């Protein structure tokens, strides 16, 4: 059961697609007080949700702030990341369980046992929002109700489930060719190569650097013949430059965000001084979306949207203030106080809260200050592209994912999990974030494999891949100035080729589970508590996940170990993928067991009575035979497997037309 409550005059977000009558609020399990909505937490209750965030799957014990933030510091004391996903679930999951969605584009704080260990408090900055309260018997039921409320998740083309290689940056066409050639030379499967900001002419959206990519169109076609898709980045700011067509059009038509005086608001990002397209304005959004056609016409069929929280390096106003203040500091004998005052001032230029309250949007017939609608910018940028694809290539699936997001954007594109680091803790965070994002509708997602920032080690990249072969978005990405982590650069290339090859063996299952989750509004990545709610031990496990209902994964997230302790919630059989072969290994009884997991092997744990389909693999998704499958199972009574298969390219995707039963 879902109830809708309206407080004040909410700003519409288009997050919800299902029409509901509103009710008058009365206190129940959630109580409305002066400082927000409160829920008394019982000792055995779990709090799930909040999508892209730090810490565990169970969100108890911290204060989270929904405020899309350009924040690469994904640490335990971080309150906000790139997404604003205002959905939580609370309860024991086997009796009455509650879901709550706060629909507002401004800042929302979720204090989940932080101030008071037994209290959950949700507070908003303004008394203008909608609350959707869901009551159901289980976690899975709550998720399904919520997902039906917010609409079907984005469906990517099947080639986008292959392995992708990225780097900030591949600076030339020849470097792209070199990457492709090295993967081919070492027999490592690959389906995509990503182009970061240096493919552009001086970081200008929808341009090509013809000095470095003189034959861009030929490069796209050449890669396509190798079954490799090029996926360029698009940023949220448009360079302020006379003679640059996109800027000239935007300025002439009034499509940029304005300051309080009605002038274009000028900020700095990669190209220097820029303007933000008013993504919330219908005409500006259509105009910006139309620009993607420039690259589509060059053969591009995938994009990633970045810097769309939106990130602000500086504003003209704050930069001027800093320069003036620096003149004063030059004359000082800086002591501990004035020195850190100076460094704090300089550091505060970037993503300054005052800047976010200094420009305006035209949205649904009204003028809003940006901070009131901040969490919609990345969502509507991605929506602009998706709606343009519907206009220009309506029957074709285009890969599209974003850094910033709000619930509702899940209908238009996926997300990657932002600028993580090459830390083992960020591998663990990737594991824990997957189900939280699924709860909020984001199915096409994954982290930068190996970590974006910092220097990766060979064992970290390999262990990360052992988990990431299960995530829909499988992309190795790293930052300029860090160690190169294309897998052919490491000592044991054969292990990387083998692990990436596993992705193509298990792809029929991964794709099938993804499509069923999207079309049925269910989870692809399940915490153990979703399947074993009455098992007190399963409810506490956070580093093992079910992919669908048939198989469990338990990734190794520690350095210098050859295995790990696994909790088996029931009797399960171990399948080991190594050297292209699947070994049906040991059967584990319910309980804790230590499992050997040597580096370079992938381990799947199959439930008794269930099937797991495996293909022969391939060097790209196009090579995989989705019909020639070997079915693995154990036990006497085996349930048929609901296998989803479509053409992977068009928008002909319905359960009724594309599911069939596989049996031993």
Description of each model-found segment:
Residues 149-166, 261-276:
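N-terminal small/glycine-rich loop or linker at the start of catalytic domains
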Residues 77, 96-101, 109-112, 141-143, ...:
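Short helix/loop capping segments that flank catalytic or ligand/cofactor-binding pockets
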Residues 1-157, 167-168, 173, 180-185, ...:
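Catalytic and substrate-binding clefts that recognize carbohydrates or anionic sugar/phosphate headgroups
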Residues 60, 73-75, 376-377, 382-398, ...:
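Catalytic core of carbohydrate-active enzymes
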Residues 82-86, 95-97, 105, 128, ...:
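Extracellular structured ligand-interaction cores
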Residues 89-95, 260-261, 569-570:
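Short acidic-glycine loop/turn motifs at beta-strand connectors
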